[in-house]
Protein backbone atom coordinates (compact mmCIF):
# COMPACT_ATOMS: atom_id res chain seq x y z
CA UNK A 1 0.00 0.00 0.00
CA UNK A 2 2.82 2.42 0.89
CA UNK A 3 4.80 1.63 -2.26
CA UNK A 4 1.86 1.86 -4.66
CA UNK A 5 0.44 5.09 -3.22
CA UNK A 6 3.92 6.64 -3.33
CA UNK A 7 4.04 5.97 -7.08
CA UNK A 8 0.47 7.09 -7.77
CA UNK A 9 0.88 10.38 -5.91
CA UNK A 10 4.02 11.35 -7.87
CA UNK A 11 2.64 10.63 -11.35
CA UNK A 12 2.03 14.36 -12.05
CA UNK A 13 5.65 15.19 -11.17
CA UNK A 14 7.05 12.44 -13.38
CA UNK A 15 4.68 13.49 -16.17
CA UNK A 16 6.02 17.04 -16.03
CA UNK A 17 9.65 15.92 -15.74
CA UNK A 18 9.39 13.81 -18.92
CA UNK A 19 7.14 16.35 -20.71
CA UNK A 20 4.37 13.82 -21.38
CA UNK A 21 0.92 14.79 -22.64
CA UNK A 22 -2.22 13.03 -21.43
CA UNK A 23 -2.43 10.65 -24.40
CA UNK A 24 1.18 9.49 -24.07
CA UNK A 25 0.87 9.17 -20.29
CA UNK A 26 -2.25 7.03 -20.67
CA UNK A 27 -0.44 4.70 -23.06
CA UNK A 28 2.61 4.43 -20.80
CA UNK A 29 0.51 3.74 -17.70
CA UNK A 30 -1.05 0.76 -19.48
CA UNK A 31 2.27 -1.07 -19.02
CA UNK A 32 1.49 -1.45 -15.31
CA UNK A 33 -1.63 -3.66 -15.65
CA UNK A 34 0.04 -5.54 -18.51
CA UNK A 35 2.89 -6.41 -16.15
CA UNK A 36 0.45 -7.44 -13.44
CA UNK A 37 -1.53 -9.70 -15.75
CA UNK A 38 1.56 -11.28 -17.28
CA UNK A 39 2.78 -12.28 -13.81
CA UNK A 40 -0.45 -13.90 -12.60
CA UNK A 41 0.37 -17.48 -13.61
CA UNK A 42 4.04 -17.05 -12.71
CA UNK A 43 3.15 -15.81 -9.23
CA UNK A 44 0.95 -18.81 -8.49
CA UNK A 45 3.62 -21.22 -9.73
CA UNK A 46 6.46 -19.64 -7.75
CA UNK A 47 4.45 -19.51 -4.52
CA UNK A 48 3.40 -23.15 -4.92
CA UNK A 49 6.91 -24.27 -5.90
CA UNK A 50 9.06 -22.32 -3.44
CA UNK A 51 6.63 -21.22 -0.73
CA UNK A 52 5.11 -17.84 0.00
CA UNK A 53 7.78 -16.85 2.56
CA UNK A 54 10.66 -16.98 0.08
CA UNK A 55 8.67 -15.38 -2.74
CA UNK A 56 7.40 -12.63 -0.44
CA UNK A 57 10.90 -11.92 0.86
CA UNK A 58 12.31 -11.55 -2.66
CA UNK A 59 9.26 -9.64 -3.96
CA UNK A 60 9.35 -7.25 -0.99
CA UNK A 61 12.90 -6.34 -2.05
CA UNK A 62 12.17 -6.09 -5.78
CA UNK A 63 8.87 -4.18 -5.54
CA UNK A 64 10.26 -0.99 -3.91
CA UNK A 65 13.42 -1.38 -6.03
CA UNK A 66 11.19 -1.15 -9.12
CA UNK A 67 9.68 1.99 -7.57
CA UNK A 68 13.16 3.53 -7.32
CA UNK A 69 13.70 2.61 -10.98
CA UNK A 70 10.58 4.60 -11.89
CA UNK A 71 11.98 7.63 -10.10
CA UNK A 72 15.20 7.32 -12.10
CA UNK A 73 13.45 7.01 -15.50
CA UNK A 74 14.68 9.65 -17.94
CA UNK A 75 12.78 8.60 -21.07
CA UNK A 76 9.43 7.19 -22.14
CA UNK A 77 11.00 3.81 -22.87
CA UNK A 78 12.60 3.58 -19.44
CA UNK A 79 9.34 4.57 -17.75
CA UNK A 80 7.34 2.01 -19.76
CA UNK A 81 9.77 -0.80 -18.96
CA UNK A 82 9.89 0.31 -15.34
CA UNK A 83 6.09 0.21 -15.04
CA UNK A 84 6.00 -3.26 -16.61
CA UNK A 85 8.51 -4.53 -14.02
CA UNK A 86 6.66 -2.63 -11.29
CA UNK A 87 3.48 -4.50 -12.24
CA UNK A 88 5.24 -7.89 -12.19
CA UNK A 89 6.80 -7.35 -8.76
CA UNK A 90 3.55 -5.91 -7.39
CA UNK A 91 1.71 -9.07 -8.38
CA UNK A 92 4.38 -11.35 -6.94
CA UNK A 93 4.08 -9.48 -3.67
CA UNK A 94 0.26 -9.55 -3.81
CA UNK A 95 -0.10 -13.30 -4.31
CA UNK A 96 2.63 -14.19 -1.81
CA UNK A 97 1.37 -11.92 0.97
CA UNK A 98 -2.24 -13.06 0.49
CA UNK A 99 -1.09 -16.69 0.67
CA UNK A 100 0.59 -15.85 3.97
CA UNK A 101 -2.65 -14.18 5.04
CA UNK A 102 -4.66 -17.30 4.25
CA UNK A 103 -2.26 -19.36 6.37
CA UNK A 104 -2.42 -16.97 9.32
CA UNK A 105 -6.21 -16.86 9.08
CA UNK A 106 -6.26 -20.66 9.19
CA UNK A 107 -4.22 -20.62 12.41
CA UNK A 108 -6.56 -18.07 13.98
CA UNK A 109 -9.54 -20.16 12.87
CA UNK A 110 -11.60 -17.02 12.23
CA UNK A 111 -11.91 -14.34 9.57
CA UNK A 112 -9.05 -11.80 9.58
CA UNK A 113 -8.28 -11.40 5.86
CA UNK A 114 -10.34 -8.21 5.45
CA UNK A 115 -8.35 -6.54 8.22
CA UNK A 116 -5.14 -7.33 6.33
CA UNK A 117 -6.56 -5.53 3.31
CA UNK A 118 -7.63 -2.70 5.61
CA UNK A 119 -3.98 -2.27 6.58
CA UNK A 120 -3.16 -1.98 2.86
CA UNK A 121 -5.65 0.90 2.60
CA UNK A 122 -4.24 2.50 5.76
CA UNK A 123 -0.69 2.23 4.39
CA UNK A 124 -1.88 3.79 1.15
CA UNK A 125 -3.34 6.70 3.10
CA UNK A 126 -0.04 7.15 4.95
CA UNK A 127 1.81 7.01 1.65
CA UNK A 128 -0.37 9.82 0.35
CA UNK A 129 0.41 11.96 3.39
CA UNK A 130 4.15 11.30 3.03
CA UNK A 131 3.98 12.22 -0.65
CA UNK A 132 2.20 15.47 0.18
CA UNK A 133 5.03 16.28 2.59
CA UNK A 134 7.68 15.40 0.00
CA UNK A 135 6.06 17.57 -2.65
CA UNK A 136 5.75 20.42 -0.16
CA UNK A 137 9.50 20.32 0.46
CA UNK A 138 10.30 19.91 -3.27
CA UNK A 139 11.86 16.47 -2.76
CA UNK A 140 12.38 14.87 -6.22
CA UNK A 141 10.63 11.53 -6.90
CA UNK A 142 13.91 9.58 -6.98
CA UNK A 143 14.92 10.74 -3.50
CA UNK A 144 11.37 10.18 -2.25
CA UNK A 145 11.30 6.62 -3.60
CA UNK A 146 14.71 5.84 -2.09
CA UNK A 147 13.33 6.82 1.31
CA UNK A 148 10.33 4.53 0.76
CA UNK A 149 12.72 1.71 -0.16
CA UNK A 150 14.60 2.21 3.11
CA UNK A 151 11.33 2.12 5.07
CA UNK A 152 10.09 -1.07 3.39
CA UNK A 153 13.50 -2.71 3.82
CA UNK A 154 13.40 -1.95 7.55
CA UNK A 155 9.89 -3.42 7.79
CA UNK A 156 10.99 -6.57 5.93
CA UNK A 157 14.02 -7.10 8.18
CA UNK A 158 11.86 -6.59 11.28
CA UNK A 159 8.94 -8.79 10.24
CA UNK A 160 10.53 -11.59 8.19
CA UNK A 161 10.99 -13.77 11.26
CA UNK A 162 7.23 -13.60 11.90
CA UNK A 163 6.29 -15.01 8.48
CA UNK A 164 4.89 -18.53 8.27
CA UNK A 165 7.79 -20.84 7.36
CA UNK A 166 5.69 -23.00 5.04
CA UNK A 167 2.27 -23.10 3.42
CA UNK A 168 0.24 -25.97 4.84
CA UNK A 169 -3.24 -27.35 4.40
CA UNK A 170 -5.51 -28.03 7.38
CA UNK A 171 -5.14 -31.42 9.05
CA UNK A 172 -7.11 -34.07 7.20
CA UNK A 173 -7.12 -32.25 3.85
CA UNK A 174 -5.12 -33.62 0.95
CA UNK A 175 -2.66 -31.31 -0.78
CA UNK A 176 -3.13 -31.31 -4.58
CA UNK A 177 -0.14 -32.91 -6.28
CA UNK A 178 -0.29 -30.86 -9.48
CA UNK A 179 0.58 -27.17 -9.49
CA UNK A 180 -1.54 -26.33 -12.53
CA UNK A 181 -5.02 -27.84 -12.60
CA UNK A 182 -8.19 -26.77 -14.32
CA UNK A 183 -10.13 -24.34 -12.08
CA UNK A 184 -13.34 -25.86 -10.76
CA UNK A 185 -16.68 -24.04 -10.66
CA UNK A 186 -16.08 -22.91 -7.09
CA UNK A 187 -12.92 -20.98 -8.08
CA UNK A 188 -14.60 -19.61 -11.22
CA UNK A 189 -17.54 -18.37 -9.13
CA UNK A 190 -15.15 -16.60 -6.77
CA UNK A 191 -13.45 -15.06 -9.80
CA UNK A 192 -16.83 -13.87 -11.14
CA UNK A 193 -17.68 -12.28 -7.79
CA UNK A 194 -14.27 -10.59 -7.64
CA UNK A 195 -14.77 -9.43 -11.25
CA UNK A 196 -18.02 -7.66 -10.37
CA UNK A 197 -16.60 -6.01 -7.28
CA UNK A 198 -13.35 -4.90 -8.93
CA UNK A 199 -15.25 -3.47 -11.90
CA UNK A 200 -17.04 -1.24 -9.39
CA UNK A 201 -13.74 -0.38 -7.67
CA UNK A 202 -12.08 0.54 -10.95
CA UNK A 203 -15.03 2.72 -11.87
CA UNK A 204 -14.81 4.61 -8.59
CA UNK A 205 -11.05 5.06 -8.87
CA UNK A 206 -11.17 6.42 -12.43
CA UNK A 207 -14.60 8.01 -12.80
CA UNK A 208 -15.83 9.23 -9.40
CA UNK A 209 -14.19 12.64 -9.83
CA UNK A 210 -15.49 12.96 -13.39
CA UNK A 211 -19.00 12.00 -12.26
CA UNK A 212 -19.00 14.69 -9.59
CA UNK A 213 -17.59 17.27 -11.98
CA UNK A 214 -19.97 16.65 -14.91
CA UNK A 215 -23.14 15.33 -13.24
CA UNK A 216 -23.20 16.63 -9.66
CA UNK A 217 -21.36 19.90 -10.43
CA UNK A 218 -20.39 20.92 -6.89
CA UNK A 219 -18.00 23.78 -6.05
CA UNK A 220 -14.52 23.10 -7.42
CA UNK A 221 -13.07 22.29 -4.00
CA UNK A 222 -15.66 19.50 -3.50
CA UNK A 223 -15.13 17.65 -6.78
CA UNK A 224 -13.00 14.97 -5.02
CA UNK A 225 -15.52 14.55 -2.20
CA UNK A 226 -17.08 11.44 -3.75
CA UNK A 227 -13.71 9.72 -4.15
CA UNK A 228 -12.69 10.61 -0.59
CA UNK A 229 -16.00 9.28 0.75
CA UNK A 230 -15.52 6.03 -1.18
CA UNK A 231 -11.96 5.53 0.07
CA UNK A 232 -12.85 6.28 3.71
CA UNK A 233 -15.66 3.73 3.93
CA UNK A 234 -13.64 1.20 1.95
CA UNK A 235 -10.87 1.33 4.55
CA UNK A 236 -13.25 1.37 7.53
CA UNK A 237 -15.36 -1.41 6.02
CA UNK A 238 -12.37 -3.73 5.80
CA UNK A 239 -11.66 -3.33 9.50
CA UNK A 240 -15.28 -4.17 10.39
CA UNK A 241 -15.85 -6.93 7.81
CA UNK A 242 -14.18 -9.69 9.84
CA UNK A 243 -16.62 -9.18 12.71
CA UNK A 244 -19.53 -9.37 10.29
CA UNK A 245 -18.14 -12.56 8.76
CA UNK A 246 -17.71 -14.13 12.21
CA UNK A 247 -21.34 -13.35 13.02
CA UNK A 248 -23.13 -13.89 9.71
CA UNK A 249 -20.73 -15.93 7.54
CA UNK A 250 -18.73 -14.98 4.46
CA UNK A 251 -21.41 -15.86 1.90
CA UNK A 252 -24.07 -13.70 3.56
CA UNK A 253 -21.65 -10.78 3.81
CA UNK A 254 -20.74 -11.08 0.11
CA UNK A 255 -24.42 -11.28 -0.83
CA UNK A 256 -25.27 -8.19 1.21
CA UNK A 257 -22.26 -6.35 -0.21
CA UNK A 258 -23.64 -6.58 -3.74
CA UNK A 259 -26.93 -5.05 -2.60
CA UNK A 260 -25.10 -2.22 -0.82
CA UNK A 261 -22.95 -1.52 -3.92
CA UNK A 262 -25.97 -1.38 -6.23
CA UNK A 263 -27.96 0.74 -3.76
CA UNK A 264 -25.15 3.27 -3.50
CA UNK A 265 -24.65 3.57 -7.25
CA UNK A 266 -28.37 3.82 -8.01
CA UNK A 267 -28.79 6.43 -5.26
CA UNK A 268 -26.19 8.62 -6.94
CA UNK A 269 -27.77 8.01 -10.37
CA UNK A 270 -31.42 8.59 -9.46
CA UNK A 271 -30.75 11.53 -7.15
CA UNK A 272 -27.75 13.40 -8.61
CA UNK A 273 -27.27 15.91 -5.82
CA UNK A 274 -24.21 16.53 -3.66
CA UNK A 275 -25.62 15.02 -0.46
CA UNK A 276 -27.25 11.95 -2.00
CA UNK A 277 -24.34 11.24 -4.36
CA UNK A 278 -21.84 11.47 -1.51
CA UNK A 279 -24.00 9.12 0.57
CA UNK A 280 -24.20 6.77 -2.40
CA UNK A 281 -20.43 6.71 -2.82
CA UNK A 282 -20.06 6.03 0.91
CA UNK A 283 -22.26 2.95 0.43
CA UNK A 284 -20.25 1.80 -2.60
CA UNK A 285 -17.03 1.99 -0.60
CA UNK A 286 -18.50 -0.02 2.25
CA UNK A 287 -19.99 -2.57 -0.16
CA UNK A 288 -16.80 -3.21 -2.10
CA UNK A 289 -14.55 -3.22 0.97
CA UNK A 290 -14.93 -6.87 1.94
CA UNK A 291 -15.70 -8.70 -1.31
CA UNK A 292 -12.20 -9.22 -2.72
CA UNK A 293 -10.57 -10.08 0.65
CA UNK A 294 -13.28 -12.68 1.28
CA UNK A 295 -12.87 -14.11 -2.23
CA UNK A 296 -9.15 -14.52 -1.54
CA UNK A 297 -9.87 -16.11 1.81
CA UNK A 298 -12.33 -18.61 0.31
CA UNK A 299 -10.00 -19.35 -2.63
CA UNK A 300 -7.23 -20.24 -0.18
CA UNK A 301 -9.44 -23.02 1.19
CA UNK A 302 -9.80 -24.74 -2.20
CA UNK A 303 -9.59 -28.53 -2.02
CA UNK A 304 -8.57 -28.90 -5.69
CA UNK A 305 -5.92 -26.19 -6.13
CA UNK A 306 -2.87 -25.09 -4.17
CA UNK A 307 -3.52 -21.81 -2.30
CA UNK A 308 -1.08 -19.75 -4.37
CA UNK A 309 -2.53 -20.98 -7.67
CA UNK A 310 -6.13 -20.55 -6.48
CA UNK A 311 -5.40 -16.99 -5.37
CA UNK A 312 -3.68 -16.20 -8.68
CA UNK A 313 -6.66 -17.57 -10.63
CA UNK A 314 -9.26 -15.56 -8.70
CA UNK A 315 -7.03 -12.49 -8.82
CA UNK A 316 -6.62 -12.79 -12.60
CA UNK A 317 -10.35 -13.02 -13.28
CA UNK A 318 -11.10 -10.21 -10.83
CA UNK A 319 -8.41 -7.97 -12.26
CA UNK A 320 -10.05 -8.11 -15.68
CA UNK A 321 -13.03 -6.39 -14.05
CA UNK A 322 -10.75 -3.67 -12.71
CA UNK A 323 -9.14 -3.31 -16.14
CA UNK A 324 -12.27 -3.46 -18.32
CA UNK A 325 -14.78 -1.62 -16.12
CA UNK A 326 -13.47 1.95 -16.59
CA UNK A 327 -13.17 1.76 -20.42
CA UNK A 328 -16.71 0.36 -20.68
CA UNK A 329 -17.90 3.31 -18.60
CA UNK A 330 -16.23 5.65 -21.08
CA UNK A 331 -17.80 4.02 -24.14
CA UNK A 332 -21.31 4.05 -22.66
CA UNK A 333 -20.90 7.60 -21.38
CA UNK A 334 -19.91 8.69 -24.89
CA UNK A 335 -22.87 6.88 -26.48
CA UNK A 336 -25.47 7.80 -23.84
CA UNK A 337 -24.35 9.61 -20.69
CA UNK A 338 -22.39 9.02 -17.50
CA UNK A 339 -25.49 8.32 -15.38
CA UNK A 340 -26.44 5.38 -17.62
CA UNK A 341 -22.89 4.09 -17.30
CA UNK A 342 -23.07 4.10 -13.50
CA UNK A 343 -26.47 2.37 -13.65
CA UNK A 344 -24.88 -0.45 -15.66
CA UNK A 345 -22.06 -0.79 -13.12
CA UNK A 346 -24.73 -1.09 -10.43
CA UNK A 347 -26.10 -4.15 -12.25
CA UNK A 348 -22.59 -5.60 -12.50
CA UNK A 349 -22.22 -5.08 -8.75
CA UNK A 350 -25.33 -7.19 -8.24
CA UNK A 351 -23.53 -10.20 -9.74
CA UNK A 352 -21.94 -10.66 -6.32
CA UNK A 353 -25.40 -11.01 -4.78
CA UNK A 354 -26.58 -13.46 -7.45
CA UNK A 355 -23.44 -15.61 -7.41
CA UNK A 356 -22.84 -15.74 -3.64
CA UNK A 357 -25.55 -18.35 -2.81
CA UNK A 358 -24.05 -20.67 -5.45
CA UNK A 359 -20.85 -20.87 -3.38
CA UNK A 360 -22.73 -22.67 -0.64
CA UNK A 361 -23.88 -25.30 -3.14
CA UNK A 362 -20.28 -25.87 -4.26
Residue ranges of model-derived segments:
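Cytoplasmic helix-loop-helix junction between adjacent transmembrane helices
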Residues: 83-119
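Helix-to-loop junctions at the C-terminal end of transmembrane segments
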Residues: 39-52, 135, 237-250, 333
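Conserved MFS/SLC helix-loop-helix module at the cytosolic interface between two early adjacent transmembrane helices
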Residues: 38-77
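Helix-breaking motifs and short loop linkers at transmembrane-helix boundaries and internal kinks
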Residues: 19, 51, 72-77, 217, ...
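Helix-loop-helix hairpin linking two adjacent transmembrane segments in secondary transporters
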Residues: 115-164
Amino acid sequence: GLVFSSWASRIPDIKDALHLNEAVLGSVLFALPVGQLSAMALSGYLVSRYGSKLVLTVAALLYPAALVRLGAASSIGQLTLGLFLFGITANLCNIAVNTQGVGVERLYNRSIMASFHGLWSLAGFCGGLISTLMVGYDVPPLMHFCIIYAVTFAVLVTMRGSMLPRDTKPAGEKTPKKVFVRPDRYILLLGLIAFGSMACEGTMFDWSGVYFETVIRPPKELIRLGYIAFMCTMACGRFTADRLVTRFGAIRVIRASGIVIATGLLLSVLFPHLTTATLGFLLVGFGTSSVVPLCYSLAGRSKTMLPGVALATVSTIGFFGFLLGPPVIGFIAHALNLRWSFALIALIGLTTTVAAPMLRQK
